[in-house]
Each structure stands twice: as structure tokens, then as C-alpha cells.
A protein has these predicted regions:
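Intrinsically disordered, low-complexity, compositionally biased regions/tails
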Residues: 15, 41, 111, 115, ...
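Short intrinsically disordered, low-complexity segments
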Residues: 8, 17-18, 141
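N-terminal secretory signal peptides that target proteins for export/translocation
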Residues: 1-9
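Surface-exposed beta-loop interaction hotspot
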Residues: 110-148
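Bacterial N-terminal signal peptides
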Residues: 13-23
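N-terminal compositionally biased, intrinsically disordered segments and leader/signal-like regions
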Residues: 5, 15, 72-75
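Acidic, serine/threonine-rich low-complexity disordered tracts
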Residues: 27-102, 144-233
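Short, surface-exposed secondary-structure junctions/capping segments
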Residues: 61, 85-91, 104-110, 129-139
């Protein structure tokens, strides 16, 4: 993906991105609570305007201790320009960034040096797709594809392709009341789609990520993550 690559090819997408930009001019902090069996994770997302797009910090605090920290630099359409990942418990320290015609991944993994290079051309790189798919949720396209670098399982240290399929509008219970949400299903692309998919719901008014339901790992319990707090700084 080149830095000039836009989320969509048609004119309305530019309007959607500009609308999202105006909504996110102020710094925001979002908190999500995720439950997977007996495991609870609190995800805190801090979003700050940082031309040409945004700077995002994500801290994931797992019950029993241990924090995974990530940072993201994005374009205005929320596609990824740079990403860092730190998980001391798994001895993972990663840095990936868009450099010309390549995405360069470097760092350490369980004491071993990591150096990888992925072609940037093709579908967009969206590492934090919970946030990065807001523009698609608000558009009218039926399907969309993107890439993301894996940090666990068979896709670890690889860049995989994902397909997003629009499921339509749904009434869901959120915050004690019924609201209209936009339902997206994300899966691995092609034949790999049989191995994983997750369901994501976004607020109709502004494309805010509200809820996730799916399995985070093969054989694991179904995980449910939901927005619990929004704060404008």
C-alpha cells in the first residue's frame, strides 16, 4: 500500500473520511471490556490528531496482570503508516512502518531478531482494524479487503489478508437501550475463511466501534468485547 492509497476509490469515501476527521479533532480516550471465558482484558485506546492522520495508543491489561502496549500512526483514512507492539510476557518487541514501496517489520521475538519486508502495494495495511474499518462501516460498499500483521498463532510475523463483508443494520442492546448498529463480519480471505471469522458492530451515526464477538484463538472460548466508556479530553 502506498501512502497515497485511499480507503475507497469513489468520491463519497473522501467525504466520509473528512467527516470522521472532523469528529476526531479532539483527543479521545475509549475503554473496552473484553471477556473470554475466565479471562478479562481492559483495552484503553487514546486517539490524538497527528497530521496527516492520527496517533493512537492502545494498552491491554489482562486480569491477573500483564500489559500489552501498542502504538499506531495512521493516515486520515485510518490506514496504518507505523505500528509498535510490546508484550514483555511473551518477549515480543516489534516495530513496523511504511517505507516507500515496502512495510518494514523489525524487532525481537523470544530472544531472536526479527527482520521482515512486505510489499506495500495492494490492499491497505490496517493494523488496528477495530478502529480502521469505521469509514467502511459508514459507506455503502458490500465488501472490502485489507492486510494486518499477525502476532500469534499460524499467522505470527506474517502479513495476512482479510475480507470484510457487510451484514446490514441491526438493533442491538447497548448501554441499556436499543440502538441501530452496523454489523460487519471479518474473516481470513479465500480458503482460509473457514478457520476464523469475527463479528463487529459499529455505531451508525459516527462509525464508532462498539462490540466484537468471536474466537481469538482456535479452541478458545467465544470472546465478547464492548465499549464501556468514551471520554473527550
Amino acid at each position: 500500500m502506498k501512502m497515497t492509497n485511499l480507503y475507497f476509490r469513489r468520491g463519497p469515501a473522501t467525504v466520509i473520511c473528512l467527516c470522521l476527521f472532523s469528529l476526531l479533532l479532539a483527543a479521545e480516550t475509549l475503554t473496552y471490556r473484553e471477556v473470554e471465558g475466565e479471562i478479562t482484558v481492559i483495552h484503553t485506546v487514546a486517539i490524538m490528531p497527528a497530521p496527516p492522520g492520527y496517533s493512537i495508543e492502545l494498552a491491554s491489561l489482562r486480569s491477573g496482570g500483564g500489559v500489552v502496549r501498542q502504538t499506531f500512526r495512521t493516515a486520515v483514512d485510518l490506514s496504518t503508516l507505523a505500528w509498535t507492539f510490546s508484550d514483555p510476557g511473551r518477549q515480543m518487541e516489534l516495530d513496523a512502518r511504511l517505507q516507500g514501496e515496502a512495510i518494514i517489520l523489525s524487532g525481537t521475538l523470544r530472544g531472536k531478531k526479527v527482520e521482515k519486508r512486505f510489499a506495500a502495494a495492494g490492499v491497505p495495511w490496517i493494523q488496528l482494524f477495530q478502529m480502521g474499518l469505521g469509514p467502511f462501516a459508514l459507506a455503502n460498499d458490500k465488501k472490502f479487503q485489507f492486510r494486518s500483521i499477525g502476532t500469534q498463532g499460524p499467522g505470527e510475523m506474517k502479513i495476512g489478508k482479510f475480507t470484510v463483508t457487510r451484514q446490514g443494520e441491526e438493533e442491538i442492546m447497548f448501554g441499556g437501550k436499543e440502538i441501530i448498529a452496523l454489523h460487519l463480519r471479518i474473516s481470513l480471505s479465500g480458503l482460509l475463511s473457514i478457520f476464523w471469522h469475527g463479528d463487529y458492530w459499529y455505531r451508525k451515526g459516527d462509525g464508532r466501534f462498539l462490540r466484537y464477538r468471536g474466537k481469538n484463538r482456535p479452541g478458545g472460548s467465544v470472546a465478547i468485547s464492548e465499549l464501556s466508556e468514551e471520554k473527550v479530553d
